[in-house]
Design a protein with these regions (language model features):
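N-terminal flexible/basic segments that precede or flank functional cores
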Residues: 1-35, 99-117
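Short polybasic/polar patches that bind polyanions
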Residues: 15, 42, 53, 83
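Short basic helix-loop element that most often maps to the first helix and adjoining turn
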Residues: 33-50
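Short alpha-helical DNA-recognition segment
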Residues: 45-63
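Glycine/charge-rich, flexible interdomain linkers and switch-proximal surface loops
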Residues: 54-56, 97-101
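DNA major-groove recognition helix of helix-turn-helix
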Residues: 66, 93
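Short, solvent-exposed alpha-helical "recognition" segments
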Residues: 69-74
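DNA major-groove recognition helix of helix-turn-helix/homeodomain DNA-binding modules
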Residues: 75-92
Length: 118
């Protein structure tokens, strides 16, 4: 029987996949924004056509967003989409702890915000 080798991850799936620190930070943020967008659309029970109308994009783009395809959508555009759907998006910048030269990127979503009817 063959034994599987398990390597502990770093906690950052994109770094573990070989992306650079900069690209990894971008992908973490984009994926969190995308998840919040997906949850908002799902929680409101909208069909893709209705979400497309509210976001002023075509249904095919909504389909890509709901399928998790981030390519072609900038962080700025995802933030704008969330705003159009009545979501507040906050960005906090603070100095990295002493001894760490490179800062980290974290994103949190508050599910309660996504559940506001609209």
């Amino acid at each position: 029987m063959t034994r599987a080798t398990v390597t502990k991850g770093s906690g950052n799936v994109f770094r573990d996949l070989g992306f650079s620190e900069e690209k990894s930070a971008e992908l973490i943020l984009k994926s969190s924004l995308l998840q919040a967008l997906q949850e908002t659309i799902k929680d409101r029970g909208w069909k893709q056509v209705e979400a497309a109308a509210r976001l002023s994009i075509d249904q095919a783009k909504v389909s890509k967003l709901l399928a998790g395809q981030m390519a072609g959508f900038s962080i700025e555009r995802l933030v704008n989409f969330l705003s159009l759907l009545g979501q507040d998006v906050e960005v906090t910048v603070r100095k990295a702890p002493r001894g760490r030269q490179i800062g980290t990127v974290r994103a949190r979503t508050t599910r309660k915000l996504a559940k506001i009817a609209g």
